[in-house]
Amino acid sequence: MSKPPLYHPVSIGNINLKGNLFLAPVAGYSDSAFRSVCIENGACFTYTEMVSAEALVRKNLKTEILMRRACNESAYAVQIFGGEPEVMAEAARIVLEKTHCECIDINCGCPVPKIVKTGAGSALTRDPDRLFKVVEAVVGAVRRVVPEPVEGPSPGPTPVTVKIRSGWEQKQITWREAAQAALDAGASAITIHPRTKAQGYEGHSDWSIMRQLVEMVNGRVPVFGSGDLFKPEDAKKMLEETGVDAVMFARGAMGNPFIFKDTTSLLTTGTYEPVPAQVRIQTGFAELERLAAETSEQHACLEMRKRFHAYSKGIPNGGPLRKAIVQAATIEDYHKIFDGLLF
């Protein structure tokens, strides 16, 4: 039996996606403006940055802004985090009411101390029993909120997916128990970032764990891989070596939404072409203008300083540009900085 092509469609519950290159939920980056330019460059599925279940239940407006659908987003996932099953269930209902998103993802991997100490994030990977209760509660909540079909039969309940880590520390590797708990509770897909909570984002992710998870799940639900994907060749290698159904770009996509287009080209044709500097900067401006429309010019210009720093990488004599970027406060400032590169 021949192997399927590396680039292929993926289904998450009732969601049918054209390909298997995803944008991960990344705090401080995965807003609707950035997701939209990733989609334009070939991202097949996108996730919001993580949203606090507690804040949703308290009706925090800032939190609701994080969940907005991008202008070109036909399907997306809202990622929520929390450690209390009842609160997570209520948050899931609010998410569906406010966004009508196609998928809800549960964060069981964030290593940030202020998240972990509440029993959320990677604390759930360490505690499979609580993880089961959280996922079960969210799955039960969304099954009671079946979306209305645009036409034809009902699409069924919104799928719930789970993102885990390999464990708490090297002496406490619990991914297998966490994944089994997620499956038993009704998760429709599992993403794994095979680093421990103690590692944070240091060292290397252990891709051999992905292969073991794929074998353990045995096709019951799709498995997605995340960790150390910084160039198209990394994605190709992960798909070949681990057998995951999809790869999820995080830091590798920051300031580089072109990684989706480049990876698609590599997987389907065996090669890809470098993105011209002009296109990189034009894409940065598209993101800037969308972010300003979603929030404010002031917020967008401050936020885009770090992003334009990434967009300008590889531009000859880019040092002076990046020094000027950290002072940019208006859209006009950015135009002056990049005058000559846009047209």
Predicted regions and their residues:
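N-terminal small/glycine-rich loop or linker at the start of catalytic domains
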Residues: 10-21, 57-75, 110-118, 157-166
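Glycine-rich, positively charged N-terminal anion/phosphate-binding segment
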Residues: 2-11, 26-102
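Active-site mouth loops of central-metabolism enzymes
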Residues: 19-29, 76-88, 124-125, 162-175
